[in-house]
Amino acid sequence: MKDVVIVDCIRTPMGRSKGGAFRNVRAEDLSAHLMKSILLRNPNLDPNEIEDIYWGCVQQTLEQGFNIARNAALLAGIPKQVGAVTVNRLCGSSMQALHDASRAIQVGDGDIFIIGGVEHMGHVPMSHGVDFHPGMAKSVAKASGMMGLTAEMLGKLHGISRQQQDEFAARSHRRAHAATVEGRFAKEIVGLEGHDASGARFFYDYDEVIRPETTVETLSQLRPVFDPVNGTVTAGTSSALSDGAAAMLVMSADRAKALGLTPRAKIRAMAVAGCDAAIMGYGPVPATQKALKRAGLTIGDIDLFELNEAFAAQSLPCVKDLGLQDVVDEKVNLNGGAIALGHPLGCSGARISTTLLNLMEEKDATLGVATMCIGLGQGIATVFERV
């Protein structure tokens, strides 16, 4: 099989979904901006050589409907003969897009792909039009479709306290703010125009979602939001609602070499796994274990991890059962995570992978894992190796 390499990876700033920077910017525009930008950053690449575009998006309706991948590609001026398809594995959609492109390259069905994803949660809410089949209640707990309650369940099963959740969430904001101030996100963010609070046009090249003032003390004052009587999960310990997109240029190693493009990493292994929908946030554990087995690696071999922070109550059990609790500050989400940056559903897989690759370069790390939970009980993971 052909080796699959990542040549480039970028993302938009993360905008707040409620009246945020991108309230007047459509999801197709966020996507097209990155498609154009990744080509501008790699002038050796002839766009006519692109085989296909795989683009993750969860809520495929309204402006995100009718194959947003193709709509964005047309807006971006991608040659008309290049295909584009929208991919949906809920929270893992853009990582699934990466996996799909990687497999196509491995079996010889193309050498050059753009992958990524988008979600404008301000324009298309997560629950818009959702209508679960009532018969699912025969085999799946009714609350399984309510992500916050699945986090409550997972946290209770693993004895995760409110204090632990508040500390983890404060850490996310603290580290994300430090990464912003120190310019560590500059290599991955491709800024674009939005609107400030007054409605004036403003060029955003930073994440609007981060709240640097967040502390354990302020978080401790928030009430549980999903289970007000007995719960511990608050809005502050949940991933923020945000708008954003991320993209990667994925190629066969041979074609990258022929074009004189320097790979940043290669795909070492990929995996998805299922788990009980009632504890959907546990998915990263079996997915990561499966990916590592395929790569012939152990947890101890991995230098850095990016674990999508859907909830603190969900992340901490995964950290514990992956055996990472003693190395969190050395290996896990060193630039914060979705609690601070937000979790635009279709974007997040490519976003955490992009952040991971930049951290691996910064830390001169060799091996990294990006993994995330997926609604209704799945996990997805990718093992990257720097080249």
Curated annotation (Swiss-Prot):
User: What species is given as this protein's source?
Assistant: Aeromonas hydrophila subsp. hydrophila (strain ATCC 7966 / DSM 30187 / BCRC 13018 / CCUG 14551 / JCM 1027 / KCTC 2358 / NCIMB 9240 / NCTC 8049)
Which EC number(s) does the record attach to this protein? 2.3.1.16
Its encoding gene is what? fadA
One Pfam family here = Thiolase_C
Sum up the protein's function in the record's words: Catalyzes the final step of fatty acid oxidation in which acetyl-CoA is released and the CoA ester of a fatty acid two carbons shorter is formed.
Q: Name one GO molecular function term.
A: acetyl-CoA C-acyltransferase activity
Where does it reside?
Answer: Cytoplasm
GO CC term (a single one): cytoplasm
On subunit structure and binding partners, the annotation says: Heterotetramer of two alpha chains (FadB) and two beta chains (FadA).
The reaction(s) catalysed by this protein are: an acyl-CoA + acetyl-CoA = a 3-oxoacyl-CoA + CoA
Instruction: Indicate the residues that form the catalytic site.
Output: 91 (acyl-thioester intermediate), 343 (proton acceptor), 373 (proton acceptor)
Q: Cross-referenced CDD domains, in alphabetical order?
A: thiolase (cd00751)
UniProt keyword annotations, A-Z: Acyltransferase, Cytoplasm, Fatty acid metabolism, Lipid degradation, Lipid metabolism, Transferase
Which named protein is this? Answer: 3-ketoacyl-CoA thiolase
